[in-house]
Structure formats: structure tokens, C-alpha cells
């Protein structure tokens, strides 16, 4: 916990990080990705799903695979897959109070779009707490965990890696941040699979089941 005393920039992934995975928002995105690929490539649903997961594994995002393998332009894909129902989310006053209490500035770093991040943050009642969003468009469609975009994220936010913490639900997105000197936090409920695959503990400074649990611990440490 001691490293958090020097943090003045708090960087959060979005989906399944700022809200629990049980809300199944990303399940909606997942289904729409399959439907988009099925239509765009004229393949069966089963083949579309296989390609979707293969590209996620091999390229970091399904979109990156479609762009590299099929020369697909990103806008139609992004608009389609993020056209989801976020009404299942509701304002989270406890989360808001915790994020607001963190000393310094707060940011969102997502492989989704800025519009999607803003919609989700507004539903949670926390959108006004964030100073900036680094999305897939900001990254020129290069996704986490590609190491080249992490310095770009730091530069856009105007923050120092050694004074920044990064909260993420996919372990494979943490090593590039840790290599730059960011304090890394992996958020995952026990017995929940990490679809990005495991990474060594040397890349993860802290583990927690969810964002509110770790923020409570951080604020207790800072207040002590």
C-alpha cells in the first residue's frame, strides 16, 4: 500500500473494472461482435465466433484482427458493437465518493470508444470525475496490451508513470504499464477466468476482487 502515497494520477480501465462483470454489458458487446462478423464476412455464427476469439487472442482486440486480416475500416464495427443497452447500470454513490476522494486526477484507458466510456460513466454517476479518456481511436486503433500505446496514453494525460496507478480486469494489459513504472492493480473475483491469459505476479502490484474493495483499502491507508 505504501506506493499509493506517491500516486497523483489514477487510471482506470472501463468495462468490468468500473462496474462488476455481473452486469453483463460486455456480453452484449460480445454478441454484437459475432453478429457483425457473421454479416460482414458471410460466415456461419460458429465461424464468426471462432474468428472473434482468435483475433482477440492474437491481436489484442477483435477489431485489430479484422483490420489486419480483412482490411476492415473501424468506424462501422465500433458503432455497431457499442450500440448496447446500459440501462442495467445505475448510479453508484459509494464508488463516486471513493473515486472523488482519491488525491489527484482520474482517467479512463479503454479499448472501447470514448462515447461508450462516457455513456457508462454517466450511468454510474461518475463521468464528471474523470479528466480525460484515452480510447481505441486515441490509440490509432492499436489496443492494449500493445506496449507502444502506453507512453502515448501517459503523454495525452500529461502524467508520470511512477506517480500513476492503473486498475484493470485483464492481467495481460498490466505488464506494459508495470514496465513503465506504473503501480498496477488486477481486479478479478475469485475463480473468475482471465480470458486474456495469466501473467507473472511480478507485473501485478496488488490484487483485489473489485474496484471498490481496493479503493477502500487505498483510502484507509492514505487516511491513516
Tell where the protein language model's regions lie, with residue ranges.
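Asp-based, Mg2+/Mn2+-dependent phosphohydrolase catalytic module
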Residues: 1-7, 100, 113-114, 118-224
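N-terminal helical cap/lid subdomain that shapes the substrate entry/recognition surface
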Residues: 3-12, 17-96, 115
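Short, surface-exposed connector motifs at secondary-structure boundaries
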Residues: 45, 101-105, 161
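Short glycine/proline-enriched coil/turn segments at helix->beta-strand junctions
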Residues: 71, 102-106, 180-182
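Residue-level marker of regulatory loop/turn positions in helix-turn-helix DNA-binding domains and
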Residues: 91, 109, 142
Amino acid at each position: 500500500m505504501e506506493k499509493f502515497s506517491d500516486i497523483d494520477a489514477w487510471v482506470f480501465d472501463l468495462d468490468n473494472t468500473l462496474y462488476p462483470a455481473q452486469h453483463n454489458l460486455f456480453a452484449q458487446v460480445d454478441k454484437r461482435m459475432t453478429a457483425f462478423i457473421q454479416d460482414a464476412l458471410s460466415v456461419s455464427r460458429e465461424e464468426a465466433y471462432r474468428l472473434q476469439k482468435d483475433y482477440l487472442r492474437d491481436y489484442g482486440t477483435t477489431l485489430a484482427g479484422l483490420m489486419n486480416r480483412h482490411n476492415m475500416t473501424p468506424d462501422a464495427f465500433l458503432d455497431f458493437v457499442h450500440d448496447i443497452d446500459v440501462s442495467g447500470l445505475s448510479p453508484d454513490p459509494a464508488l463516486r465518493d471513493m473515486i472523488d476522494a482519491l488525491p489527484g486526477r482520474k482517467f479512463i484507458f479503454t479499448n472501447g470508444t470514448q462515447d461508450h466510456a462516457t455513456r457508462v460513466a454517466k450511468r454510474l454517476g461518475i463521468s464528471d470525475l474523470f479528466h480525460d479518456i484515452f480510447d481505441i481511436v486515441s490509440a490509432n486503433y492499436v489496443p492494449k496490451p500493445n506496449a507502444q500505446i502506453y507512453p502515448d496514453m501517459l503523454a495525452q494525460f500529461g502524467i508520470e508513470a511512477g506517480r500513476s496507478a492503473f486498475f484493470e480486469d485483464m492481467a495481460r494489459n498490466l505488464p506494459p504499464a508495470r514496465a513503465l513504472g506504473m503501480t498496477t492493480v488486477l481486479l478479478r473475483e475469485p475463480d473468475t477466468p482471465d480470458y486474456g491469459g495469466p501473467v507473472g505476479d511480478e507485473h501485478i502490484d496488488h490484487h483485489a476482487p473489485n474496484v471498490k474493495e481496493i479503493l477502500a483499502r487505498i483510502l484507509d491507508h492514505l487516511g491513516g
